[in-house]
Amino acid sequence: MGKVFRSYFYFFVLLQIFAGTSFADDSLLRINSILDSHCIQCHGEGGKVKGKVNLKELQSANLLSSKPELLESLIGVIKDREMPPEEETPLSDSEREELLKWLEVKLSDSIKDQPFLPTQIRRMNRFQYNNSVVDLLELDRPIFRLNERLMRRRDNYFKPETRKMPPQVRISTRPLSKDIDNQRPEGFRGVASFPQDKRAEHGYDNRADHLTLSPLLMESFLNLSQTISESPDLNSKECRSWSWLFASPESANAEDVEEIIRTRLTKLLRRAFRRPVDPVTLDRFVKFTLDQRDAGATFEDSMRSVIAVVLSMPDFLYFYGVSDSKNPADESAKKQIIRDFELASRLALFFWSSIPDDVLLDLAAEGKLSDPKVLSLQIDRMLNDHKSSRFCDNFPAQWLQLDRLITSVPDPKKFSYFYLVDGYRSSMHMMPEPLLLFETIFIEDRSIIELLDPKYTWENAMLKANYEGHAKAGHDVVTQLFKRVPLSDPRRGGVISNAAVMTMTATPTRTQPITRGAWINAVIFNDPPEPPPADIPPLPEDDTEELAKLTIRERLAAHRERKDCAGCHNKIDPMGFAMENYGPTGVWRDKYENGRDVDVSGVLFNQHEFKTFLEFKEIIVKEKERFVRGFISHLLSYALSRELGPTDSPALDEMTDRAMSGEDSMRAVLKSIAMSDPFLQMDNFKRNEKIEDSKSKVPQSP
């Protein structure tokens, strides 16, 4: 971890800055003398580097200015009051503010001419692929059983254009082979499975560095596209594009048929490839279609063959940009404004997890989409479109890491009420609570602060019973009626204090304050802690007679005694122990099983003392700027499909300031991201190598 040593390092560097001295030789001698005594032995001496901090590399002020990551870290430890260390004299508020301003100016100067972090060329993930095929072919239902959707809507209540959620909704949270409302199979018959996607640690499943296209995967996509084109469910009843794509032309004249094919393929390929199709490619596809017909295939079967080819091509599977620069080397040297067609794709991926529609593509073709006024109106239109439900299907569940709840199995002997009829668990009633809260804030365009402290929640009878620590029998455990209810108990509500999060961050028998604290740091503030040392053993699940007498805080005391653990625990433990009133299934408790009182007291952000959970919650809301910045940074990372870096900091600062000044509604925040510099700048990657290499591996039938 090395956080203690880093704090010493930052402290002594900043003393020089605050004193107004430069990194002249005499000051370097004095700093090095201190560092030799406290830090060098672990951070540079003999090639030994702990915590990825090498103090011997620091030789001048210019070198410090050339390290934006270091400057960003300095700003972070000052804001979090991790610097100076506890053993040193603390900075006054005025000193701290002055230092932060100075460092932020240095960081701004350091990165002003630097490009944004590159986004690798990335392929579609499973969710994006399904949505893109559905939108391309205008299908009435998914081609896959969408396990990514942890919650399914059984009412047609998602109507963002109304800005109003109904008082009750019918949903389900269990993957089913049948659609409950109309008894249609979910997913197209005969469609092959999609290759398994990876998810980045502390990231999302749309991250470019985890979405590649190896030869083995390419073979899988070829098979997948073939099965889609051959599915019996791809028919005139399920496919609204049938009339303009698959239906045989009325005219039998060869010239008319060729022109009709060309017109249809122009529309299809522009949609599929998210840009105008070049004449050579279009001619190849037209010739391929005509050759199919000359070989005896029907018009419908010829178009099915075209679909099979299109859905397996890198032009469809990959998302990438095209630079205006004729010299690829120039792309990494400067920031370039994004092209309109790439902007259309980026917007559709962010809000719809899909391809752009014809409106976006038409505006891109006219060069109007990047106009700020036009862009603003299009963002409003996209957020009011029903397809924005996909954003609510995808982002909040990943942000909150709710898939962890699926594998939560509280001890049946201790928590028998958790298990319902036929093996169903209470977790399926816990999951909708935070997801419906997110949807409400999105649809009604409410303040994102309500994610922390709403005055309402969503519950059904079985979830209410779980909070009370008992079971409620019910026959309809799959399709659930959730009602929006006002909160009279301030201990409930929000994305932190709910049964779903409390259950998924516990073991089968006990709570895990460290896990809960790490979750709050990573999810709520986007400040994930470093992994613990490999030699730290987990707490035993089975209590010995001696351990049974201790509280969780007493059991974990040994971890804090290690110098390489103390720094992280100072940040994690207060947040984790603040949640100790919530048992392993989210039921409130004041005492442990051994009769000992639950102690939730702590110091938050190294400055705010609290003794109860409610005091903790008040501090979190009071320090809402930390949450606002963390939430926006999560959204920006999701929108860009990459991790963030120092060059993104100015945009994050600007968006956070705007939200704190009153523009904190969900849609205002989403719009600010889609109109931010990082979102509107060209990806700085070398396009040709990977995309052309992948194209060479695809059978080029046309």
Regions found by a protein language model. Give the residues of each.
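A short acidic, often aromatic-flanked loop/helix-cap motif at beta-alpha or helix-coil junctions
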Residues: 60-64
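Bacterial N-terminal signal peptides
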Residues: 8-19
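N-terminal secretory signal peptides that target proteins for export/translocation
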Residues: 1-7
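Low-complexity, glycine/serine/threonine/alanine-rich intrinsically disordered linker
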Residues: 25-51, 65-73, 77-702
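Signal peptide processing junction and immediate N-terminal pro/mature segment
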Residues: 21-23
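Residue-level detector of conserved, well-ordered beta-strand and adjacent loop positions
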Residues: 56-59, 84
